């Protein structure tokens, strides 16, 4: 599969220390427009920094790439206001002869940005010109260029990043407020014996004069000044700001400019990860530079023409909880090239060594991530058709992403298209889809309910002891799986909502996402986060809930610090 030799990659995690870390560390879980390639070495530098500059500390994350780890802030967008000078947020090593390698902190002159995800740029440092991924840069001297600014990420995603046990107290980020347009939020990690590792959220308000404040007695002309101040003084916060929240390089939008239908010879299959009825999955390398996952389909599995048409739709689906489709080999045998997820399928992960250490908070969080990806599919009026743990992929930090969306519709195998053959996933399929072929987002909701049983049972096959024909008959008669062992009733109630006979009575994925993200949330700031219905929670379940988050308002410094009730 191609003779090109892979360049060794050493991706770095973005961890910065604004000041020496707190000793308390809590463990736990005129530019030429002709692109020319610069021969930059594949290394990472670690410059010293103060606020507004850039630094990085090398750290391997998953062994290959970091696209499957945590959500990276979405900073760059279309050029506005005539801005053409950008700063690099990450190192980037060129993948093709027309790419431009650059280092974090490098200033780049954008020649044009009409190419969408890949812009033609001229490095003011090296003098080289080439294409760059637009989401790796931000306008110079802008708030987007600050490493602590994470832009439009959700409260829940900020908590997922900050609750990494490796983060010391005071690890922080600044994000857009979800509830107040034009406002920001400072999210800070904290620790105490009552709640364990938790996150506090402080609303940053804007002055009419253009300044910012958390408490009105201490005002700042810029967010940079605010962050610099609270890095030295807690002054009512739960802790002074210590480290910028670590994150990783984002995925590029595609492998390179114009790299969609690629030659088979550009791929090297290296490690077989698994196989199924219709093909195999490999870890491999594209163009000798880029780690990818490659799904190979057996000839005859689906029409190449139909697949290519569907793939054009699939590549437009972009969400942090969907596995990114990078490229295709459209002649048989069809190859589907996606981002590589280091931990493999959720099903294998649950049944493997790591599965035994997963507790309810982690399982619910994984379910919430899947629901988030499917809520996006729902908004885009798309249907997955084969939602189950085997089609969810896991990366570092328990990041989960939905894979293989839409492919089931294209399979031409008779044992599959009959919908009752051995290859068809009857146990995950809604009755109206299995019996009449009515696949909708609501049949995906049914499948999500089955997936919840896979999570709570660590990968057990649904409907244990029953064959496919029996499952179909019993479900039509009203049978639903009972509550799995050690699963709270409130979660089983959610499963049963997903399994309502009338598809229109099933919840939306938007609802499922909100329910699961708030599953351990309490309205009182001092309470450990419990289930939506705490009365249905057992003592054993309560003992597992050791993480929480609050929105807090800083008060004037006093002998005893007081945190008000969370903001809505």
Curated annotation (Swiss-Prot):
Record EC number:
2.7.10.2
* Residues the record lists as binding ATP: 273-281, 295
**CDD domains in alphabetical order:** PTKc_Src_Fyn_like, SH2_Src_Src, SH3_Src
Gene3D superfamilies recorded: Phosphorylase Kinase, domain 1 (3.30.200.20), SH2 domain (3.30.505.10), SH3 Domains (2.30.30.40), Transferase(Phosphotransferase) domain 1 (1.10.510.10)
Boundaries of each Protein kinase domain copy?
A: 267-520
Q: Does the keyword Acetylation apply?
A: no
> Which sites are catalytic?
386 (proton acceptor)
InterPro entries of this UniProt entry? Kinase-like_dom_sf, Non-receptor_tyrosine_kinases, Prot_kinase_dom, Protein_kinase_ATP_BS, Ser-Thr/Tyr_kinase_cat_dom, SH2, SH2_dom_sf, SH3-like_dom_sf
| PTM field | The phosphorylated form is termed pp60v-src.
Function, as annotated: This phosphoprotein, required for both the initiation and the maintenance of neoplastic transformation, is a protein kinase that catalyzes the phosphorylation of tyrosine residues in vitro.
Name by which UniProt lists this protein:
Tyrosine-protein kinase transforming protein Src
């Amino acid at each position: 599969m191609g003779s090109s030799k892979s360049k060794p990659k050493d991706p770095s995690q973005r961890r910065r220390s604004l000041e020496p870390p707190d000793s308390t560390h809590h463990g736990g879980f005129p530019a030429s427009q002709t692109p020319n390639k610069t021969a930059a070495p594949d290394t990472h530098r670690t410059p010293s920094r103060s606020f507004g500059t850039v630094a990085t500390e090398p750290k391997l994350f998953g062994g290959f790439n970091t696209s499957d780890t945590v959500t990276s802030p979405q900073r760059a967008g279309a050029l506005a206001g005539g801005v053409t000078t950008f700063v690099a947020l990450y190192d980037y090593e060129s993948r093709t002869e027309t790419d431009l390698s650059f280092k974090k902190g490098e200033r780049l002159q954008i020649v044009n940005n009409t190419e969408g995800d890949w812009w033609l740029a001229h490095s003011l440092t090296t003098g080289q010109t080439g294409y760059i991924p637009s989401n790796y840069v931000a306008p110079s001297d802008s708030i987007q260029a600050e490493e602590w600014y994470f832009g439009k990420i959700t409260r829940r995603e900020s908590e997922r990043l900050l609750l990494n046990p490796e983060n010391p107290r005071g690890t922080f980020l600044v994000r857009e407020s979800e509830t107040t347009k034009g406002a920001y939020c400072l999210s800070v990690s904290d620790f105490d014996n009552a709640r364990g590792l938790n996150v506090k959220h402080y609303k940053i308000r804007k002055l009419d004069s253009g300044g910012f404040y958390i408490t009105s007695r201490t005002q700042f002309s810029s967010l940079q000044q605010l962050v610099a101040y609270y890095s030295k003084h807690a002054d009512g916060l739960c802790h002074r700001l210590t480290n910028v929240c670590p994150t990783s390089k984002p995925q590029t939008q595609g492998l390179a400019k114009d790299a969609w239908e690629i030659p088979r010879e550009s791929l090297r299959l290296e490690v077989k990860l698994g196989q199924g009825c219709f093909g195999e999955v490999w870890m491999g390398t594209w163009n000798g530079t880029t780690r990818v996952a490659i799904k190979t389909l057996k000839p005859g599995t689906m029409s190449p023409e139909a697949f290519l048409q569907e793939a054009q739709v699939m590549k437009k689906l972009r969400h942090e909880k969907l596995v990114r489709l990078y490229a295709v080999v459209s002649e048989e045998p069809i190859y589907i090239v996606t981002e590589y997820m280091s931990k493999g399928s959720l099903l294998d992960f649950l049944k493997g060594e790591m599965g035994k250490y997963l507790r309810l908070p982690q399982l619910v969080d994984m379910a919430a991530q899947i629901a988030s990806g499917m809520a996006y599919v729902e908004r885009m009026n798309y249907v997955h058709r084969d939602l189950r743990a085997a089609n969810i992929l896991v990366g570092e930090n328990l990041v989960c992403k939905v894979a293989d969306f839409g492919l089931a519709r294209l399979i031409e195998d008779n044992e599959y298209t009959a919908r009752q053959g051995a290859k068809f996933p009857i146990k995950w399929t809604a009755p109206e889809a299995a019996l009449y072929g009515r696949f909708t987002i609501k049949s995906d909701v049914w499948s999500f309910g089955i997936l919840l049983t896979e999570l709570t049972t660590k990968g057990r096959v649904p409907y244990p002891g029953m064959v496919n024909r029996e499952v179909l008959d019993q479900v039509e008669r009203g049978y639903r799986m009972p509550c799995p062992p050690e699963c709270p009733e409130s979660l089983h109630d959610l499963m049963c909502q997903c399994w309502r006979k009338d598809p229109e009575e099933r919840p939306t994925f938007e609802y499922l996402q909100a329910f699961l993200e708030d599953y351990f949330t309490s309205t009182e700031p001092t309470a450990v986060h419990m289930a939506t219905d705490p009365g249905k929670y057992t003592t054993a379940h309560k003992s597992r809930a050791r993480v929480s988050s609050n929105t807090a308002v800083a008060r004037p410094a006093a002998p005893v610090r007081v945190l008000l009730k969370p903001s809505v």
